[in-house]
Amino acid sequence: MAPSNLPAIFNPTQQDIEMLLAAQCHLGAKNLQVHMEPYLWKTRPDGVNVLNIGKTWEKIVLAARIIVAIDNPADICVISARPYGQRAVLKFASHTGATAIAGRFTPGNFTNYITRSFREPRLVIVTDPRTDAQAIKEASYVNIPVIALCDGDSPTEYVDVAIPTNNKGRHAIGLVWWMLAREVLRLRGTLANRETEWDVMTDLYFYRDPEAEENKDSAGVEEAKVPGADEVGPAAVADGFTSEWEVSGASAGAFTAQAAAAPGASWDADTTDWAASGEAQTGNEGWGTEAAAPAATTQW
């Protein structure tokens, strides 16, 4: 990492550098835009451009000082059309008081005053200059300064402050937004001093796949579900499935008093007669005579 040009109070800690490296904020694209060359550290043999983490931290501090200079936090507009940054900008807006636009940027938000979504921000922060090109273009029409998270191949036209970082990874995007929010709160005095840890975890700024979360929740419900609860009802679940469901052999026609007797009813005399017969009755004789009677009345 190159020597820092910041005052000693703004120097990053060892933990900050390790977090930036763990989130792969230093891994850029294989293509390199000419205006991003000052932020290049080296190029790996496989062609991947490695960004300078020291420059990334310097630009995070510079962007935070610009944000703090805005009197009304609501005049700051944070934008992310990339899905990996939508959760991050919403969390950043909730912690700093900025206005978030997560998702598609409606053309005319900054230039067409007739639309209901018309805004006049004093500062615009975007996640990716390529996907948020419409917002940057409209900001240039109305002279709004722009701060952007720029990769090695990101276009920097009409970008006033470029934060060199990996703006395609979900962890890299979330971590940079988290560090930017923490630095803003430090400069505003919300955090007592720079040694005070922020109680908000970086995981809150990371992207979460809704389908993966839904599948995880459904898998947990299926594991906690008792087998057969939907088929037999809650009564059988309460009994613990202790009843005998299948009966075969000579006892197929027997009906025990323990399973059939209701509370307060005396069925003992009847049960002894039912079980007294040694021969298993099939029941075909009794039903056959009754079923044959309607056959004689087919003539009208």
Swiss-Prot record:
Keywords associated with the record: Cytoplasm, Ribonucleoprotein, Ribosomal protein
A GO CC term attached to the entry: cytosolic small ribosomal subunit
Pfam families found in the cross-reference section: 40S_SA_C, Ribosomal_S2
Major subcellular location class: cytoplasm
Region annotated Disordered, chain positions: 278-300
GO molecular function, one term: structural constituent of ribosome
Gene3D superfamilies linked to this entry: Glucose-6-phosphate isomerase like protein, domain 1 (3.40.50.10490)
UniProt function note: Required for the assembly and/or stability of the 40S ribosomal subunit. Required for the processing of the 20S rRNA-precursor to mature 18S rRNA in a late step of the maturation of 40S ribosomal subunits.
PANTHER family in UniProt: 40S RIBOSOMAL PROTEIN SA
Assembly mode: Component of the small ribosomal subunit. Mature ribosomes consist of a small (40S) and a large (60S) subunit. The 40S subunit contains about 33 different proteins and 1 molecule of RNA (18S). The 60S subunit contains about 49 different proteins and 3 molecules of RNA (25S, 5.8S and 5S). Interacts with rps21.
HAMAP family xrefs: Ribosomal_S2_euk (MF_03015)
Protein's recorded name: Small ribosomal subunit protein uS2
The organism's taxonomic lineage, starting at the top: Eukaryota, Fungi, Dikarya, Ascomycota, Pezizomycotina
Gene: rps0
